[in-house]
């Protein structure tokens, strides 16, 4: 036992962290089923989540090595998690960054939400968001005139970069194809495609064309409607791209994808929002989490008192690939 323990501590903290993270990988497994079984605590289901958590855990490891060189195991480093996160708050990191780093360490150390020692992160307020707000340094290196078609394409479809860079001509779906795809997915028990098709047909019953967002954030697949004044030019480009060819061979790295997703979300909300005066606060609708809530969403924080159509918010969330309605409101829907 002593020799094995000695051998363990010869590994650096980085090696110990890497080994632990490798053991948590569950790529390709169903997170939905794991949630039902209550076994998601020590698993990471997405490659992008793994890479993000790995990066932020390495920041923590570097801090431990610098400030607590006597610590030789990740197990003993656990007691410094709160100290590290408090330092990050003092350094002026955004609430989003703090929440992300806390999520990474909570997952790594399996710190449950009801654990009294779990770090209490600062609230994330819409007014504090800096991403895609105002002029940024990268905007100086991006010509809106030269990239006009790319911008319009993004505003009509709400892409994340990873999906746009992999988009093929075959990813255009008309309503008939969605219906056929749903039948095929049911035969093959392809649950992700079944949900994508059912959501498209249910939430966007008046739309004719959709883009397949294949294996987006979290490995999710969805069909989002093509909307807005540039809809026809998007459909034309898709139809004139051969099925296996990339629609865009190059996507400028300075393109503000998040900002154009916000344009898409805002346009979509306005398209589906009903006049608030026609809605009834007492009328309940079923939300994504299975709970019944008023069809009127009342904003908080800096927009306290503003009322929005919860049904339209739900449609926007589905199109963006988010489950939580507050994400659509806080990060995307603007200037209403």
Cite the ranges covered by each PLM segment.
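Short, basic/aromatic-rich helical patch in the C-terminal catalytic core of site-specific tyrosine
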Residues: 164, 258-273, 316-317
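C-terminal catalytic core of Y-nucleophile DNA break-rejoin enzymes
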Residues: 215-236, 244-264
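Short functional hotspots where side chains directly engage DNA or cofactors
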Residues: 179-180, 210-213, 291-336
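Short, charged phosphate-coordinating catalytic segments
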Residues: 154-204
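N-terminal core-binding DNA-recognition domain of tyrosine recombinases/integrases
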Residues: 2-3, 26-125
């Amino acid at each position: 036992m002593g020799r094995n323990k000695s051998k363990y501590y010869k590994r650096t903290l980085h090696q110990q962290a890497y080994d632990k993270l490798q053991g948590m990988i569950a790529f390709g497994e169903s997170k939905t089923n794991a949630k039902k079984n209550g076994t998601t605590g020590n698993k990471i289901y997405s490659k992008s989540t793994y890479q993000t958590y790995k990066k932020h855990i390495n920041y923590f490891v570097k801090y431990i090595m610098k400030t607590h060189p006597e610590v030789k195991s990740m197990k003993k480093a656990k007691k410094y998690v709160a100290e590290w996160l408090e330092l990050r708050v003092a350094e002026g990191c955004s609430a989003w960054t703090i929440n992300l780093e806390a999520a990474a360490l909570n997952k790594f150390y399996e710190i449950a939400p009801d654990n009294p020692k779990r770090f209490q992160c600062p609230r994330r307020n819409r007014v504090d968001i800096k991403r895609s707000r105002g002029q940024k340094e990268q905007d100086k290196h991006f010509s809106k005139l030269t990239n006009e078609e790319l911008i319009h394409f993004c505003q009509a479809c709400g892409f994340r970069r990873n999906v746009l860079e992999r988009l093929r001509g075959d990813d255009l779906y008309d309503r008939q194809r969605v219906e056929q795809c749903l039948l095929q997915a049911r035969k093959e028990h392809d649950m992700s495609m079944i949900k994508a098709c059912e959501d498209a047909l249910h939430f966007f019953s008046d739309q004719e064309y959709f883009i397949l967002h294949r294996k987006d954030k979290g490995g999710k697949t969805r069909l989002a409607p093509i909307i807005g004044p540039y809809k026809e030019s998007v459909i034309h480009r898709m139809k004139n791209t051969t099925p296996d060819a990339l629609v865009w061979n190059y996507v400028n790295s300075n393109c503000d994808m998040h900002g154009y997703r916000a344009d898409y979300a805002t346009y979509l909300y306005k398209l589906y929002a009903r006049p608030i005066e026609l809605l009834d606060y007492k009328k309940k609708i079923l939300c994504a989490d299975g709970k019944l809530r008023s069809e009127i969403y009342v904003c908080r924080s800096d927009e306290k008192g503003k009322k929005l159509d919860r049904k339209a918010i739900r449609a926007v969330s589905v199109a963006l690939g988010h489950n939580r309605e507050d994400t659509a409101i806080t990060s995307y829907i603007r200037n209403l």
